[in-house]
Design a protein with these regions (language model features):
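Conserved ATP-binding/catalytic core of the eukaryotic-like protein kinase fold
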Residues: 1-169
């Protein structure tokens, strides 16, 4: 369903975690965008639309996921970015890296310390930066940023410093 499948997960304590995931031959959307920029070209709009549409299917799948009892899991990816959209050699785009995703009816911004944000700043929704309650709209904001960047061939909010990036958003 346009999401890279995780087959096995193991917590190895201090050594970290081990994930066995679906192998996707291809590259991430960020790499495709960089390659287009380095050759002074843009990804054709119809190709961009296909990739974004496929990635959006994966996001929708995650957002609609339910538990065994049928209750919504309310999954929020929180790190939707070109680097987390894998474009396979088979032409299918898949969403990857749910490492900081949250599944609960009250999705709060998780922090590991004061002012420690999770996710890539240039793709964060304003409510994510503020530490407000999050829902699927947070991920849709990030997807919108990706759409703009793919079609325009340049970054939307990225600035010279993190503070300047936050100000632009």
């Amino acid at each position: 369903p346009n999401v890279v499948q995780v087959y096995e997960f193991s917590n190895e304590g201090e050594e970290g975690h081990i994930l066995a995931m679906e192998y996707v031959e291809g590259c991430d959307l960020g790499h495709l965008m960089s390659a287009a920029k380095s050759t002074a070209t843009r990804i054709p709009p119809w190709v961009a639309a296909w990739i974004i549409g496929e990635a959006a299917k994966g996001l929708h799948y995650a957002h609609e996921k339910r538990d065994e009892g049928g209750a919504p899991l309310d999954i929020v990816h929180r790190d939707v970015s070109p680097q987390n959209v894998l474009v396979g050699a088979d032409g299918v785009a898949r969403l990857v890296d749910f490492g900081i995703a949250r599944a609960s009816s009250k999705n709060r911004q998780a922090t590991t310390g004061e002012n420690d944000l999770k996710g890539k700043l240039a793709y964060m929704a304003p409510e994510q930066m503020r530490g407000d309650e999050l829902d699927r709209r947070t991920d849709l904001f990030a997807m919108g940023v990706i759409v703009w960047e793919v079609l325009c061939g340049k970054r939307l909010f990225k600035a010279d410093s993190e503070a300047a990036t936050l100000q632009r958003i």
